[in-house]
UniProtKB/Swiss-Prot annotation:
Record's function text: One of the components of the core complex of photosystem II (PSII). PSII is a light-driven water:plastoquinone oxidoreductase that uses light energy to abstract electrons from H(2)O, generating O(2) and a proton gradient subsequently used for ATP formation. It consists of a core antenna complex that captures photons, and an electron transfer chain that converts photonic excitation into a charge separation.
Protein's cellular compartments: Cellular thylakoid membrane
Mode of membrane association: Single-pass membrane protein
Record note on quaternary structure: PSII is composed of 1 copy each of membrane proteins PsbA, PsbB, PsbC, PsbD, PsbE, PsbF, PsbH, PsbI, PsbJ, PsbK, PsbL, PsbM, PsbT, PsbX, PsbY, Psb30/Ycf12, peripheral proteins PsbO, CyanoQ (PsbQ), PsbU, PsbV and a large number of cofactors. It forms dimeric complexes.
Keyword Thylakoid among record annotations: yes
GO biological process terms on file: photosynthesis
Alphabetical UniProt keywords: Membrane, Photosynthesis, Photosystem II, Reaction center, Thylakoid, Transmembrane, Transmembrane helix
Organism domain of life: Bacteria
Name of the protein in its database record: Photosystem II reaction center protein J
Gene3D superfamilies in the cross-refs: 6.10.250.2070
């Protein structure tokens, strides 16, 4: 078993000397996407789709 892994097999957030276990540059390029990034993209998509519906509902109003 690796010296860096905890008893549950996960890599700790910090090394014993206090440095981060994973460099911040690699946090953005490896592994899964951060939840806040997924939620932000999803929220923007929902607002965009709702905007399209509101735009469509007002198209033609007053043209008749």
């Amino acid at each position: 078993m690796s010296k860096l892994k905890g008893p549950d097999g996960r890599i700790p957030d910090r090394l014993p000397d206090g440095r981060p276990a994973v460099a911040w540059e690699r946090r953005w390029t490896e592994g899964t996407l951060p939840l806040w990034l997924v939620a932000t993209a999803g929220g923007i998509a929902v607002i965009f789709v709702l905007g399209i519906f509101f735009y469509g509902s007002y198209q033609g109003v007053g043209a008749g």
